[in-house]
Amino acid sequence: MIVTLTLNPSLDRAVEVERLEPGTVIRATRATLDPGGKGVNVSRALLAASVPSRAVLPVGGPEGDQLVRLLRAEGVDVVAVQIRGGTRSNITLAEPDGTITKINEPGPTLSADELDAITEAVLAATGTADWVAACGSLPPGVTDDYYARLCGRLVSAGIRVAVDTSGPALLAAVSAGPTVVKPNREELAEAVDAPLRSVGEAVEAAQVLRSKGARDVLVSLGSDGALLVSEQGVVSGNAHVAEPRSTVGAGDALLAGYLAAGADGSAALAEGLAWAAAAVALPGSRMPAADQIHRTAVRLHDRTNLSRPLVSSG
């Protein structure tokens, strides 16, 4: 069982357009409405591949009710913690060439009592859990050390923890000793306050996070693939996608596949890459079913080329 926590979930509307032209009326060629949020997407990806998961999330207002309905319609085991504020809505605009424009609301402010209730819900959900994946941005009212404090309690209880966040929250969480953190290139660069122009620089930055407390660092690099830096060394890989549709949720699918495969070494990285590639081939933030995951598309690199330049933000 993998428990996920999404502190700032959303309703995600994805709209496909032929071309985004500011200041004009644009006709959509396709629109979808999906549950959103990093942890939510991890649970959805796990469910689609028949891996047991439970999603803990705060919800409020009509949008929150709709979010829970959508998740339960997909079969997700939801632990909904009611809050006074309304769940946010996000919009993604996708163009045929793969260009993505996102409009994300900040989300509701959480009170101290609401945050305590969420924490207790996570702890109560971990009875048979192998992992807790704490994912996404922190909503207003939540201090940067929240994931670190939660991670500390979970690690003390013998539960493995994955953290996917950014900025000060990522740096604080690393100090609490999570099993794995999953930044993308931009988030990793922000964490070390330096540009990452090559694979080698990304590896060095990941080692910095390991030196601060993270056991493993899984870095999503977009079209450049992904990178795993751990006690066993460095392994990298990528997966070809013939017809990309949307990158929304690809990093979440990467983490889900990695955790589902045991979160250890090159085999887990390969599984994560296969899940991520399958997600990119789907519209909006749809997560791939088991029969949509093509592992033959994955290529792991026996020797990571540290001088290879990075072209994608991840």
Set out the residue ranges of the language-model regions.
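Glycine-rich phosphate/adenosyl-contacting loop at the front of the ribokinase-like
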Residues: 1-56, 65-66, 241-244, 306-314
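Hydrophobic anchor at the start of a short beta-strand
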Residues: 2, 52-54, 78, 161, ...
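Conserved N-terminal subdomain of the carbohydrate kinase-like
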Residues: 18, 47-129, 297-314
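Short beta-strand scaffold segments in enzyme catalytic cores
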Residues: 44, 89-93, 225-229
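Short, small-residue-enriched loops and turns at beta-alpha junctions
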Residues: 108-111, 138-142, 169-172, 190, ...
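Short acidic, glycine-rich surface-loop motifs adjacent to enzyme active sites
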Residues: 126-139
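Conserved phosphate/ATP/ADP-binding segment of small-molecule kinases
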Residues: 145-161, 165-232
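Conserved phosphate-binding/catalytic region of the ribokinase-like
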Residues: 200-314
